[in-house]
Amino acid sequence: MGFSGKTYHQFDRKFSETTEGKKCVITGISLHSTVKPISLSSSAVSNTEDEDLCPTTPTADSVRIPTVIPCPPAPKKRKLTLKVSYGPREFFSPPDLETVFIYRTT
């Protein structure tokens, strides 16, 4: 949904006749409304002015922002281990292969 090019929306109103006269029914919502000024007594204004004269910043150690600790460096890649072949492999070759195995009688 996009916004319309208007800067404000107006009310859509319907009027209906009653025995008391005309009645206005609001069917839309306005995005802009006027704000009425607030009137305060002079004693209430003077009490709030005394409190607002010198605002202070809390200086206790518990409310201070902690110092930034630098992040550790990124982990490094491990080096690949190279498999070195030192020539052809030699296997055990007995003169008589049957002597290597043990025969069991069951």
Swiss-Prot record:
Keywords: Cell cycle, Protein kinase inhibitor. The gene is SMR15. It comes from the Eukaryota. One of its GO terms (biological process) is regulation of DNA endoreduplication. GO terms for molecular function: protein kinase inhibitor activity. Transmembrane segments: none annotated. InterPro entries: SMR (IPR040389). Probable cyclin-dependent protein kinase (CDK) inhibitor that functions as a repressor of mitosis in the endoreduplication cell cycle. This is Cyclin-dependent protein kinase inhibitor SMR15.
